[in-house]
Amino acid sequence: MKKGYEVLRDPHLNKGMAFTLEERQQLNIHGLLPPCFLGQDAQVYSILKNFERLTSDLDRYILLMSLQDRNEKLFYKVLTSDIERFMPIVYTPTVGLACQHYGLAFRRPRGLFITIHDRGHIATMLQSWPESVIKAIVVTDGERILGLGDLGCYGMGIPVGKLALYTACGGVKPHQCLPVMLDVGTDNETLLKDPLYIGLRHKRIRGQAYDDLLDEFMEAVTSRYGMNCLIQFEDFANANAFRLLHKYRNKYCTFNDDIQGTASVAVAGLLAALRITKNRLSDHTVLFQGAGEAALGIANLIVMAMQKEGVSKEEAIKRIWMVDSKGLIVKGRASLTPEKEHFAHEHCEMKNLEDIVKDIKPTVLIGVAAIGGAFTQQILQDMAAFNKRPIIFALSNPTSKAECTAEQLYKYTEGRGIFASGSPFDPVTLPSGQTLYPGQGNNSYVFPGVALGVISCGLKHIGDDVFLTTAEVIAQEVSEENLQEGRLYPPLVTIQQVSLKIAVRIAKEAYRNNTASTYPQPEDLEAFIRSQVYSTDYNCFVADSYTWPEEAMKVKL
């Protein structure tokens, strides 16, 4: 056990002025703190007052991240006290701004920075990390950060923010989480010229050297932390994201949140929307604006969900259309990747999205291309003309990249549109006086619960069925009252309960399918998983002190 000033410098141990007098004396920190004793609730109040005093979301982000560096328990106590308020600060949309200014906001290193020049030595670098038990890693190479593109080493803000939500929303213990940046350079000329840039100052290394780095990283991580260590890939460029997922998914315990997590939350929204449209998913025609990893991930999970309804895979694929930067994806068109070719149909080539919407007449329109304003007034009005209750998801992040706003959607569909977005939007009051609360299809509904479930049962590999199961659980947690208010997702205040239910369901299916590795199987799975959840309450550091009977303590001469 640390003592003295080291206790106050360790965010895992530090309680600030919540240390009792006895703790201060026993830990040799008496006199290193003001002669004041504050409870955790008073400390939360102090942080909230400072938070409210700030006017910039970036400054609020820095305030909270500084707190995480000082007092971990208090940081998570603050986050969980009002998750709906703080999630947009520690994650989307503010984390995107924080990544763009990461050099300016950088205070204290958090996570592991591994570069292309460290090949052959990654195992040694992992030994430098102070924690010997790591259950979850979020790793990025910074090439496709949200909808902002290549931010290189500045992308470290994403794994840090993601893992904060692993704990705040899922209860995964923070000391068992490790954010990792794989720095192979950046093609962002602005960053290469930025005097505050904290990463390697050269163009991205690609090809065999890049693949060798990834292979070594995966082998080193599992050698150090075990084959059941969860490795989440985050914000890799499209080409690498699919390739690496296919390469590693059956060898390691891994998933890609941009492909599979986004798919799960989008399908959850669609399943909830079906309770409004009163039909089946396989009755719908889906059009995607975008054909990257998010779109393809959603499309593949929709196919799986339609198959579960009894439709063949071929029939399900016929109901899905995609538009990329070159237009409608059709058979015979040039520049189609194998993943896109999967959803190419016999149709003439078309480029304009408004014309495509008029021609295809989709019942579901999903935007994941990070093109702000792509869903024009004409498109929204056409969707309302084709459908009694059009389903329109503007899932691109951050807010500036959203295909349309909630207000535009409700206005141009005359309040009939069923809406979900990737970033938060304020409630909208219709001319009728009804107030609608746009559903935010945030991946944070998915990955914390998935992580908790996977870690709790020691799941060996994470298949797409896990994400369809997760989508079903999320949709089931949406009440009729939520739907009447325009919400396609459970209120964020319930996200910890939702994550727990996801974890329990994943673990149950893992034990049923013999894919779990934590044995013996707990008799009460929910109670077992609850026992694994992180507590934000302070630990007591007073030594266990007691006395013996006086006769037993007599000194014999």
Swiss-Prot record:
Q: Which residues form the active site?
A: Y91, K162
Q: What class of enzyme is it?
A: oxidoreductase
Listed EC numbers: 1.1.1.40
Listed binding positions for substrate are R144, K162, N443
Q: Where in the cell is it found?
A: Cytoplasm
The site annotation (Important for activity) covers D258
Can you tell me which residues bind NADP(+)? R144, N238, A291, G292, E293, A294, S325, N397, N443
Q: Which domain of life is it from?
A: Eukaryota
GO terms for biological process, alphabetical: malate metabolic process
Q: List residue numbers at the site (Confers specificity for NADP).
A: K340
Annotated binding of Mn(2+), by residue: E234, D235, D258
Pfam families per record: malic (PF00390), Malic_M (PF03949)
Self-association state and partner proteins as the record states: Homotetramer.
Name this protein carries in UniProt: NADP-dependent malic enzyme
